[in-house]
UniProtKB/Swiss-Prot annotation:
InterPro entries: AKR_Detox_Biosynth (IPR050523), NADP_OxRdtase_dom (IPR023210), NADP_OxRdtase_dom_sf (IPR036812). Keywords: Oxidoreductase. It is an enzyme of class 1 (oxidoreductase). Belongs to the aldo/keto reductase family. Aldo/keto reductase 2 subfamily. Its EC number is 1.1.1.-. The keyword Oxidoreductase applies. The lineage of its organism: Eukaryota, Fungi, Dikarya, Ascomycota, Saccharomycotina. Disulfide bonds: none annotated. It comes from the Eukaryota. Putative aryl-alcohol dehydrogenase. It holds the Pfam family Aldo_ket_red. This is Putative aryl-alcohol dehydrogenase YFL057C. PANTHER family: ARYL-ALCOHOL DEHYDROGENASE AAD10-RELATED, NADH-SPECIFIC METHYLGLYOXAL REDUCTASE-RELATED. GO terms for molecular function: oxidoreductase activity.
Amino acid sequence: MARHFGMALAPWDVMGGGRFQSKKAMEERRKNGEGIRSFVGASEQTDAEIKISEALAKVAEEHGTESVTAIAIAYVRSKAKNVFPLVGGRKIEHLKQNIEALSIKLTPEQIKYLESIIPFDVGFPTNFIGDDPAVTKKASLLTAMSAQISFD
């Protein structure tokens, strides 16, 4: 809908709730007796969060930065026009990393690499009703069960 009507997007939680941290940052946290801030869930990264963090760190290194945060924001901003991620932070360094993302342009290869790390779950309701047929050129399962429609 946003693409169709030319609307902007303001995604939240693009940094995984602070759970996307490099190995170095996690070691530093452990050394200082800090876990990951969390209202619910474990104070350690899940396997998926570790994989994502490692991939973000690899791309960050290619851009000459240690900030997985900047890469995560740059990735989300690269996915569509007019994307304005909601970001936060508790420290000046967080703000600087958020700003750094504005100067990072990911290559198509880097985007493809990041997307290959774990399968993306679009979540409800899109996983129920399907993607925009004007883009995919195919009907969702729900639509296909009710009528034959051409999206050409």
